[in-house]
Amino acid sequence: KPFDKNVPFSDRADSVIAWLQLPEEVRPHLIMWYMEEPDGVGHRATPDSSATLSTVEHLDRILGDFFAEARRLDIFDQIDFIVLSDHGMATYYPENYVNLNDYLPRDSFDYVFDGVPTLLYPKPTYTDSAYAILKRVPRVTVWRKNEIPEKFVYGKNPRIGDLFVLPDIGTYLQFRPESCPV
């Protein structure tokens, strides 16, 4: 069944239960069920907002109801359930905004991936200088590509920037000419 963001989350849960009740010969052997929240509300209203909390509570009820229904199935003990998220969130504070333009000339980079982490692709002659400057920037930690700690599970992928910059929790890091987007 194709993804449809307009289908309520509870209806999606009901669909999964219905599929699990199909005869074995037609029952799906892999079911993936996606809920795009609380990502959207967390980005719009901040992770600490009452709107985000309300959404998390709503999703928790749906998952609770789903597992209560699933436990009633004869095949429950044969099912492996994996519940995961694509990332976490933290509220950032305007006083912790770090504009990389205050430290580095943007034209010294071939490409910049703004995000958490920030991945920088400096021009070959600028890597060492950029690294040295970033080591002195408050509320951020920088690693060279070959020094990224294993806990981040980035390996040695060629798409990873030469510099991996991670802001402290509560810090917003960007390479933008304008002020903090709060």
Regions found by a protein language model. Give the residues of each.
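Acidic/histidine-rich catalytic neighborhood
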Residues: 78, 85-125
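Structural motif
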Residues: 30-34, 82
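Short, solvent-exposed loop/turn and secondary-structure capping segments
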Residues: 43-46, 93-96, 176-178
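A long, amphipathic alpha-helix that forms part
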Residues: 9-21, 38-79
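Active-site neighborhoods of enzymes that stabilize oxyanions during catalysis
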Residues: 111-182
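Sec/Tat-exported extracytoplasmic proteins
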Residues: 20-24, 35, 67-74, 124, ...
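Active-site-proximal alpha/beta segments of enzymes that process anionic O-linked groups
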Residues: 1-25, 145-146
